[in-house]
Swiss-Prot record:
This protein's name: Large ribosomal subunit protein uL2m
Species this chain originates from: Rattus norvegicus (Rat)
InterPro entries: NA-bd_OB-fold (IPR012340), Rib_uL2_dom2 (IPR014722), Ribosomal_uL2 (IPR002171), Ribosomal_uL2_C (IPR022669), Ribosomal_uL2_RNA-bd_dom (IPR022666), Translation_prot_SH3-like_sf (IPR008991)
GO cellular component: mitochondrial large ribosomal subunit; nucleoplasm
GO function terms (MF aspect): RNA binding; structural constituent of ribosome
Family designation: Belongs to the universal ribosomal protein uL2 family.
Presence of keyword Flavoprotein: no
Oligomeric and partner information: Component of the mitochondrial ribosome large subunit (39S) which comprises a 16S rRNA and about 50 distinct proteins.
Short name of one Pfam family: Ribosomal_L2_C
Domain of life: Eukaryota
Length: 304
């Protein structure tokens, strides 16, 4: 349709005039311009390069979180709207919402400053505030010549002093809420959060608002933890955890009040299609999943 309209428009022009000839658009390759539009060779249109809209990401792609140097200042971030890099919708429940700034959280609690010995150190809580990118509150702590954001615990407030340690002694420590210790240094039954799965990797478990885990027992250099889902996890004793419960305990009791507030939070409405409740609906008695282990124990064949 567009090609026919372009051909009729070009036929209506006087091609003898050099001024009009210079203004003729060049949209088609050389082979197609003379055949389809019956134009003289002087009006031959150059070939064009096709545009690839679904090109794959390069193998050298680095996330923007890795490109930017750590800072306590808010960083502007762009919303995805539930789309991936090709523009296709991957998550239908995401879209819109108020603009948000990202604050870099340091999930590795025991991180000594450069040029210092890896010894326990203290930090002071400067402020505890709301974070739009997560359900828990965050705390700005300062120690030495640096500041950083961490996940705040339930009773953490400005002016508190927290301890970060990597030492495992013969006796269990009397840790205070907000302190970070290896699991091997904590007494059995301690409530913990922000647990590492591997030493030095940073907290990956129990980071949501109001959640906490329990240190059940310690066996042969490993620690058994009960997650908020009641599932048990086995990690090395040298993995770091924070003592206490994550802040914003009443997060699950908030009242949204209206549909518009969910749109402010970037949540799109679900389909209104009625679905018959089948076997998936309702509560069931299910056995607990097996214990998840992050400990690479030697196999029986290797020991024999």
């Amino acid at each position: 349709m567009a090609l026919c309209a372009l051909a009729s428009a070009l036929r209506s022009l006087s091609l003898a005039s050099p001024a009009i000839t210079a203004r003729v658009p060049t949209l088609l390759p050389v082979g197609q311009s003379n055949v389809l539009l019956q134009l003289p060779s002087a009006l031959a249109l150059p070939a064009h390069r096709p545009v690839h809209m679904s090109a794959d990401r390069s193998a050298k792609f680095v996330s923007w979180k890795s490109r930017i140097k750590y800072t306590v200042k808010p960083v502007k971030m762009r919303k995805s709207g539930g789309r991936d890099h090709t523009g296709r919708i991957r998550v239908h429940g995401i879209g819109g919402g108020h603009k948000q700034n990202y604050r870099m959280i340091d999930f590795l609690r025991f991180r000594p400053e450069k040029g210092t010995e890896p010894e326990p150190f203290e930090e002071k809580v400067v402020v505890v505030r709301y974070d739009p990118c997560r359900s828990a509150d965050i705390a700005l702590v300062a120690g030495g010549s640096r500041k950083r954001w961490i996940i705040a615990t339930e009773n953490m407030k400005a002016g508190d002093t927290i301890l970060n340690s990597n030492h495992i002694g013969r006796m269990a420590v009397a840790a205070q809420e907000g302190d970070a210790h290896p699991l091997g240094a904590l007494p059995v039954g301690t409530l913990i959060n922000n647990v590492e799965s591997e030493p030095g990797r940073g907290a990956q478990y129990i980071r949501a608002a109001g959640t906490c885990g329990v240190l059940l027992r310690k066996v042969n250099g490993t620690a058994i933890i009960q997650l908020p889902s009641k599932r048990q996890m086995q990690v090395l004793e040298s993995c770091t955890a924070t003592v206490g419960r994550v802040s914003n305990v009443n997060h699950n009791q908030r009242v949204i009040g209206k549909a518009g507030r969910n749109r402010w939070l970037g949540k799109r409405p679900n389909s209104g299609l009625w679905q018959r409740k089948g076997g998936w609906a309702g509560r069931k008695i299910r056995p607990l999943p097996p214990m998840k282990s992050y400990v690479k124990l030697p196999s029986a064949a290797a020991q024999s």
